[in-house]
Amino acid sequence: MSVEMVSDSTFQKSVIDASQEKLVVVEFSTKEKLNKRGEPNASAKMDSVIDGLDAQYAGEIEFFRVEVNLVWDYSDPQKPMAKDDLNPAASSAYEINHGPTLVFLLEGERVQENLLGFYDEASTRQKLDELLKDLNSRLLKIKLFRFIEEQINLAAQRVITKKSAQLDDIAYGKLGVFLGLRRTLQNDTTAQDIGMLDAMNDSLQCLGVLGKGETILERIK
């Protein structure tokens, strides 16, 4: 699988949407891949590294590539600026003035300073592993929210499509539990939610899933 190439017109749908669920790395790579000596330049080398990492981090990190053509503007000799004429909106948004540059996004926001220049595979992998470790709690919470939303939709659908006049207690129970968890994680807890969570904590502690005195919210967060 090759790294998806995106442009100004597809950046929002491809990159920003993907970053709502997992860490996204965007490589801004120069269109020109050779240096003046006719050898692979830094962008060409970084392309190869990112292509390899794309397979290694499948499911954990989503990689994208944006081609840039940087033209230097010397209208102000004291503050020359590099401007991209291929995908100026994305390049401007992330202050790209060098290729290659890596941008790291989660939930549509940068989670680390841009990484400029070429890094070999081992160095890049080390930086990615450190970032994943730093973002671990946040990534787990995103996965949990997605799971909760899926369970809410499944339970609600089962309640709605129930053909029997008898209430589906299991579906209603699941719906109540997951709605309560969602409200709690969104800091909109009700008294009923607190009672439900206390009961869940007691049960999970008895089963050994949680340690003595530990709560499900502590485990989640």
State each model region's role.
Residues D169-N187:
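N-terminal interaction modules that seed assembly of large macromolecular complexes
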Residues I152, A156-V159, R182-T189, L204-G211:
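A structural signal for well-ordered alpha-helices, especially hydrophobic packing surfaces
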Residues E4-V24:
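A short beta-strand-turn-helix
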Residues S137-Y172:
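N-terminal acidic leader/helix
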Residues N97-N136:
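Non-catalytic, surface beta->alpha helical segment in thiol-disulfide oxidoreductase systems
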Residues V68-G99, T190-K221:
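Charged low-complexity stretches with an acidic bias
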Residues A18-G38:
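Short active-site neighborhood of thiol/selenol oxidoreductases, capturing the structured segment around
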Residues E4-S7, F28-T30, N41, M46-D85:
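Thiol-based oxidoreductase modules, predominantly thioredoxin-like and allied folds used
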